[in-house]
Amino acid sequence: MHLIPKELDKLVISQLGFLAQRRLARGVRLNHAEAAALISSNLQELIRDGHYSVADLMSIGKTMLGRRHVLPSVVHTLVELQVEGTFPTGTYLVTVHHPISSDDGDLEKALYGSFLPIPPADTFPDPNPDDYLPEKMPGAVLPVKNERITLNDGRKRIRLKVMSKGDRPIQVGSHYHFIETNPQLHFDRLRAYGYRLDIPAGTSVRFEPGDTKTVTLVEIAGNRIIKGGNSIASGKVDISRAEEILQRLQVEGFAHVPEPAPTADSALIAPFTMDREAYARMFGPTTGDLVRLGLTNLWVRVEKDCTVYGDECAFGGGKTLREGMGQSSERSATECLDTVITNALIIDWSGIYKADIGIKNGLISAIGKAGNPDMMDGVHPDMIVGSSTDVIAGENKIVTAGGFDTHIHFICPQQVDEALASGITTFLGGGTGPSTGTNATTCTPGPTLMRQMIQACDGLPINVGITGKGNDSGGKSIEEQIRAGAAGLKLHEDWGSTPAAIDTCLDMCDKFDVQCMIHTDTLNESGFVEQTVKSFKNRTIHTYHTEGAGGGHAPDIISVVEHPNVLPSSTNPTRPFTMNTLDEHLDMLMVCHHLSKNIPEDVAFAESRIRAETIAAEDVLHDLGAISMMSSDSQAMGRCGEVILRTWNTAHKNKAQRGPLKEDEGTGADNFRVKRYISKYTINPAIAQGMSHLIGSVEVGKLADLVIWHPSTFGTKPAQVLKSGMIVASQMGDPNGSIPTIEPVVMRRQFGAFVPSTSIMWVSQASIDDGIVQSYGLKKRIEAVRNCRNIGKKDMKFNDVMPKMRVDPESYVVEADGVLCDAEPAEALPLTQDYFVY
């Protein structure tokens, strides 16, 4: 067949395109991926037919699917589609703008080449206009109404008459020093000294040959130093240099047409203002604007904007981040950022706000206003953009900290790609691959296996911490594992979570400052939950799947959320409670824990762990902030690529059933609830595991492990994932494409994934002090966990509630502070079939 990679890549389009045709033919409304694949696949077939031009196909692509054939969200998200194929004249790009542009489309064209029967017209419902209201669209932005934003507020302005005597068009950008513009522009250059156009940052004014325009100029800000351009007026703005500058203009042949001194006060010249909606489209939402998170019922309101109106950073042709404009000149790399993320909406436990994010040496070096302090207002001294700075456009994007999954069974290395594609950048757990022990427990036992697993994970583009086996009432083996590099210890009932083992394990954790995680005794063999809690002796411990379906004292392990030394987490199969939750769990549990349906006691053990009442209560306790963390239990009763989306589905369900939180009442937004839920998979696991000094939040001094989202796909599929400020995974098109947006657009590993030092190997301090980990030949950055033992529930951000718990041992009814914790199972959730093909 002699195929090459670009041909194999296109097979994804054909496979999914034909799948989408089959679904369409049986009356299923298509989601974004299906609709994009169907149109792309048909275009490829029409290209192969050889009868159509690029222009023909650009038109045909808009006629295949109508609004009735796709889910309402697709009309908003599928605004452009690009394919490349081999025409009789070679490879060319076909761009289809607004592919869903009619109600009815053309099913004959949509099912082209499939030989499938065309379904009756009444198979698909008539589009309901209410489904397409702006506020119902995924990632909707609702700017503050009836307000305008003033650009470059408080600065001096002038008006100048400008005539173009050139024979070609001249376009001048917002931040180009106006005195330095094309010599064929005729105007009073001395009056323009120290000024630039008073227009939105990154826009421009175009002068066609012979044009005469009156433009408004505004003073440059910052240090007021001119650099770059034509080097006519370089240096600090100083009117005493006027004669010198005039002579240079004359020598260099720049047209200068003096104007009479203005009679009106420059303060009377109105500044440029922008409609809030137009501003949001260009630079992203700003203070007071509302943003919907995906298709959930959650809305955030921007709390503040650290950028400066009129001096925003914008990269591209004619934009602001150019030499001598938004990019400063004559500065060393030591003074400038390595990378800047511009105009990002940050969603973090620390706030929900708009800012530029500065990255240097793999760390978040500053958050605020970036740019060129020589001509821009409010530039943070640690956020200078220079010729050594790269740019990631964050406008109309959301940036969060990389997610942290603290419950990983290292069953297969391919988990990393799934997790990265969902926004997870840190794994903590144990195992040795698909061994029987690892299929059930997160333990890497013994120093040999510990070393081998640490070495095996060295090339994975994700932060990793390996947990040892803590089930040993004698401490010698546990100490060996810690000294071999264990970042924590796991107690699991399948290895025997007895009070004696718990006591010894916690002693060793206290001695070496590592965290203890526990899966308690479902059998109640050594005692009930009270005996296990007693064995903790008020020492800090992280309780896994605290509800109990994932394992733990039946039926009341959930009661441990009341204790100040317990750091409770959930695993995601029970998140949130739905009509299907109970039915999937029995078989899941039997496989995971090596049980047999032929042994009645095994079946009874499994059934004792699956209780609708406690799963429903888990929903409520998350919303109260009593369960502090979310994790997966990867391939061992959990899904490593769904920690984040199930967190937000839980938040959505709780808002739908329980209403706004008290803290959010009257705000018109859900900021408090959003901070509570994002903390569950970012900052709180980082605090619990002794890693929050470097990861877990979007804060200065932390590793630049960041996830960039389109608001419309928030919580499901990130646009890009950064590790130490370097892109490790991104939605990326055909590598042979003329541009990076050619279908199929797939989450793919990027260059950062091949730089091991962008990720951390978390180990114990003892393993570093003994020089053991250094002998492993690792390329990853080695860091010790710390401050694991003197923390408690009080340290869990937005999730520190400790209600007095009661669980009825017969009915399983759960009460918190005397209030019934009950929730109905969801019949549908937002972050599901609109986003995923399977």
Curated annotation (Swiss-Prot):
Carboxylation allows a single lysine to coordinate two nickel ions. Pathway: Nitrogen metabolism; urea degradation; CO(2) and NH(3) from urea (urease route): step 1/1. Substrate binds at H492. GO terms for cellular component: urease complex. Keywords: Hydrolase, Metal-binding, Nickel. CDD domains: Urease_alpha (cd00375), Urease_beta (cd00407), Urease_gamma (cd00390). The keyword Metal-binding applies. InterPro entries: Amidohydro-rel, Metal-dep_hydrolase_composite, Metal_Hydrolase, Urease, Urease_alpha_N_dom, Urease_AS, Urease_asu, Urease_asu_c. Ni(2+) 1 binds at H407, H409, K490, D633. It catalyses: urea + 2 H2O + H(+) = hydrogencarbonate + 2 NH4(+). GO terms for biological process: urea catabolic process. The active site is at H593. SUPFAM superfamilies: Composite domain of metallo-dependent hydrolases, Metallo-dependent hydrolases, Urease, beta-subunit, Urease, gamma-subunit. This is Urease. It comes from Aspergillus fumigatus (strain ATCC MYA-4609 / CBS 101355 / FGSC A1100 / Af293) (Neosartorya fumigata).
